[in-house]
Design a protein with these regions (language model features):
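Conserved non-cysteine loop/helix-boundary elements of the Radical SAM core domain that shape
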Residues: 6-24, 43-190, 194-251, 255, ...
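Short, electropositive alpha-helical surface patch
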Residues: 14-21, 201-217, 278-296, 433-444
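Active-site/acyl-donor-binding loops of N-acyltransferases
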Residues: 229, 424-431, 435-449
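C-terminal accessory regions of radical SAM enzymes
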Residues: 244-361
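Conserved GNAT acetyl-CoA-binding A-motif
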Residues: 411-425
């Protein structure tokens, strides 16, 4: 389950809890065959500007004409909605609550979690999106308490000069801190990176990408690559009109992305290349939606292919589990070392993997239950989906690869001197790990070594 868009950490805690609880309510309804569509639309119509009929502001923003920032304009447009949110906060402070209030308690969320553990429709991963400068120790703990296992985070650039000229609002040091916090808490890190920003060139972008995986402080597990495209409401319009910024040509972008693909390590998954923006909204910039395919075709013409996970997934291929080799890729991180365990075919096609974090044992952890623990950050087996308990010849899922990966992680952690192996399990996978020797902790599950 992915909560896309915006800065999740900006929202009040009460709203965050309510929103996630409603996700688990929806999973419960869906698993039971309950359809509450009518109730939802009725509630939206009576109580929220999210309903199209209530979303009355119709303002066209032109970046070249803005006297205020884009966010300032939007805040002025939605002043009424912001006032309503403040009033709700005041009511909550006075312990008042109405049926349509976007509010739930931690106890209500935890009860929804418990129901989902063995529900027909389980949450096997929960993702939110935020900014580096909005992450703190307390926020990371809150995100984990919600049940999240992965965080999408906008790096955009690893150049302070580029971040500053594009008014990003934070520096590279904030990104370093955020990645370290997330990694220490065991989260999977899904970064966003934007070439062709104001102040960048194809050459500096390639250097930026080399830094992304060359420096231990970064090295994300997954990555979205969003080359900058110009839309009319962006302040970048005025720079384009003055000739201070221009989009990369097709060939410039193609050569840059070929270099990017060649530099991507096997432990990273390039989940998306090119953002889905309607071509009619793009003033200038790339409008080719299958640019990834063009890059892969260009690599193939050179006798190469991307080493990233997505390019190597077995997907619908028949898999002989006995013929797979267990490969280990060790690398440094900002908290210690990482081990990327993967079951691969002869052509390095990937059938399953596990991410194991090995933090410095003596280094203090801001999460008490992780002190001195190695951490399984992800276990994933590829191939066609199967029902729980189902098996099928030639399918990677439910063929024992996950258990074999876990047992190898146990061996590595014990050999490295750890007395405990923690896992950042999703709500719907708690039962799976209990069957494999893990006990419930406060925010994680643990197996003594």
């Amino acid at each position: 389950m992915i909560v896309l868009g915006g800065t999740w950490s900006f929202y009040p805690e009460a709203y965050q809890i309510w929103f996630i609880k409603r996700i688990f309510d929806a999973l419960e309804d869906f698993g039971a065959g309950v359809d509450r569509t009518g109730d939802v639309w009725a509630a939206l119509e009576s109580a929220s500007q999210l309903h199209p009929a209530n979303n009355t502001p119709q303002v066209a923003l032109h970046g070249a004409e803005l006297q205020r920032t884009y966010n300032q304009v939007v805040q002025s447009i939605y002043a009424d909605e912001m006032r309503r949110s403040r009033e709700l906060g005041e009511r909550l402070a006075e312990q008042e609550r109405s049926p349509v209030d976007e509010y739930a308690t931690w106890e209500e969320l935890e009860a929804a979690h418990a129901r989902n553990e063995d529900a027909p429709c389980r949450c096997v991963g929960l993702v939110v999106e935020t900014r580096p400068d909005h992450l703190s120790e307390a926020e990371v703990i809150r995100i984990r308490r919600l049940g999240c296992t992965k965080v999408q985070i906008g790096f955009q650039s690893l150049s302070d000069a580029v971040l500053k000229v594009n008014k990003r609002g934070h520096d590279v040091a904030a990104t370093r801190r955020a990645v370290k916090l997330l990694r220490r808490a065991g989260f999977k890190i899904h970064a966003h990176w934007m070439p062709n920003l104001l102040g960048a060139t194809p050459e500096t972008d390639l250097e930026d990408y080399q830094r992304l995986f060359g420096e231990p402080d970064f090295r994300p597990d997954e990555l979205k690559i969003y080359p900058c495209s110009l839309i009319e409401s962006a302040e970048l319009m005025r720079f384009y009109q003055r000739g201070d910024w221009k989009p990369y040509t097709h060939n410039q972008l193609l050569e840059l992305l070929i270099g990017v693909f060649q530099l991507t390590p096997e432990y990273c998954r390039l989940t998306r290349v090119i953002r889905d923006i309607p071509g009619t909204d793009i003033v200038v910039g790339n409008k080719t939606t299958n640019f990834r395919q063009l890059v892969e075709n260009a690599l193939a013409a050179r006798g190469e292919r991307s080493a990233d996970i997505r390019a190597r997934e077995v997907r619908f291929r028949s898999v002989d589990a006995g013929a797979l080799a267990l490969d280990e890729l060790w690398y440094e991180s900002s908290i210690g070392r990482e081990v990327f365990l993967q079951f691969i075919a002869e052509d390095r096609g990937i059938a399953g993997f596990l991410r194991l974090a090995l933090p410095e044992i003596q280094a203090p952890s801001f999460i008490e239950e992780l002190q001195g623990s190695a951490i399984i950050r992800e276990v994933h087996v590829y191939g066609q989906s199967l029902e729980i308990g189902e098996n099928a010849p030639g399918k990677a899922q439910h063929s024992g690869l996950g258990l074999r990966l876990i047992e190898r992680a146990v061996e590595i952690a014990a050999a490295q001197g750890y007395g405990d192996l923690a896992v950042i399990s999703a709500i719907g996978t708690r039962g799976y790990y209990r069957k494999r020797g893990f006990d419930d902790g406060k925010l994680y599950q643990h197996r003594k070594l």
